[in-house]
Amino acid sequence: MQQLKKVVLAYSGGVDTSVCIPYLKNEYGISEVVTFVADLGQGEDLELVRQKALNSGASKSIVGNLVNSFVERYAFPAIRANALYLDKYPLSTALARPLIAENLVNIAREINADAVAHGCTGKGNDQVRFDLAINALGPDLKIITPAREWNMSREEAILYGEKFGIPAPVSKKSPYSIDVNLLGRSIEAGILEDPMQEAPEDIFSMTSSVNNSPDSHQDIEIVFKNGFPVGINDQFLTPVEIIQRANNLAGKHGFGRIDMIEDRVVGIKSREIYETPGLLLLIKAHKELESITLNPDVIDFKGMVEKKWGQLVYQGFWFGPLKESLDAFISSTQTSVNGRVKIRLYKGNAIVIGRMSENNSLYREDLATYSKDDVFNHSLAEGFIYMWGMSNKIWAELNSKTKD
């Protein structure tokens, strides 16, 4: 087998990716490990992360600002798709993986690397997402997955890293695995592996507890154009600002926590904790606006598309042909999704209290009203019902005779 000399490693500064650096050099004999750190709005000092990679043995460490691309190319399409895996999880972590993989491949091309690598474990979802995305964009590139091969527990990985002077970022007593980006936080491992164990309050940072949230509600309005959120409370914002503002508003009122049993790609169930206040809020508002601007049959069919879209993204097929086709359908439905939605935030809840679309509303008050202004032709109902239920009536008549 050809000796690999230069590898690009997706790097986060966590246990697994930090340990990957000396492991690749000592176990694989790779001379140059170039790390790539993705700035996804995680609010971390990435210069410190970059320096940690160098201190851990990386020959070079690159930081890429992907925040705008992450929101515009990944988060906003997910909002249009009302993407909720298992009707709960808005894919905050899953959406980041194909973007990171895309940049890994691009950097590998630029520096003539022999391979790309990541620190995903052998029973997580991210290994699938990274590998599938890399294979789609750089099918000629070799993928190295040390954490999938070394068969070390998290505690053993920490000890391995300490031999090379790599400090552990987590407590050995309760080693939570936490992933953070602008869209939210995912927390797993430690005491959370007991599905009956309540998640401790100290693992949350984006959302207030119900007890500590404001005692008075706050009403907000979210404005959409072509299915994209463009403003909050009549203030038009950039896509990144939209997510930031939604995070702050929803999180302050304790909305956006998810505690779920998740069906992983590899076939096991896992307990996951998520904080995604802004993304959940925007999806809720978007779905509500669709209820007044889309035809019933479009809403019904789009619901099936949304479920499949979420599954594909969760399972790693962001760059697959079916996902691309579903994108085209979803996009075609969004030209009329224009308007605003009013939501009341209070004690962990986001309650829709109003919705309107000035030019695209299919709701007509003169048809829906029960007042004297009603223009609905009630006399047509009898004939409609007769035709609508005719097949059922014929079936009932036939079967009642058969029973006799």
From Swiss-Prot:
UniProt entry tagged with the keyword Amino-acid biosynthesis: yes
Entry's Gene Ontology cellular component terms: cytoplasm
EC number per UniProt: 6.3.4.5
Stored SUPFAM superfamilies: Adenine nucleotide alpha hydrolases-like, Argininosuccinate synthetase, C-terminal domain
BP GO terms, sorted: argininosuccinate metabolic process; L-arginine biosynthetic process; urea cycle
Name of a matching Pfam family: Arginosuc_syn_C
Keyword Nucleotide-binding: yes
Entry's localization field: Cytoplasm
InterPro entries given in the database record: Arginosuc_syn_C (IPR048268), Arginosuc_syn_N (IPR048267), Arginosuc_synth (IPR001518), Arginosuc_synth_CS (IPR018223), Arginosuc_synth_type_1_subfam (IPR023434), AS_cat/multimer_dom_body (IPR024074), Rossmann-like_a/b/a_fold (IPR014729)
Any one GO MF annotation of this record: ATP binding
Reactions catalysed, as given in the entry: L-citrulline + L-aspartate + ATP = 2-(N(omega)-L-arginino)succinate + AMP + diphosphate + H(+)
Signal peptide start-end: none
Keywords annotated in UniProt: Amino-acid biosynthesis, Arginine biosynthesis, ATP-binding, Cytoplasm, Ligase, Nucleotide-binding
PANTHER family xrefs: ARGININOSUCCINATE SYNTHASE (PTHR11587:SF2)
Family: Belongs to the argininosuccinate synthase family. Type 1 subfamily.
The protein, known as: Argininosuccinate synthase
Species in which this protein is naturally found: Prochlorococcus marinus (strain AS9601)
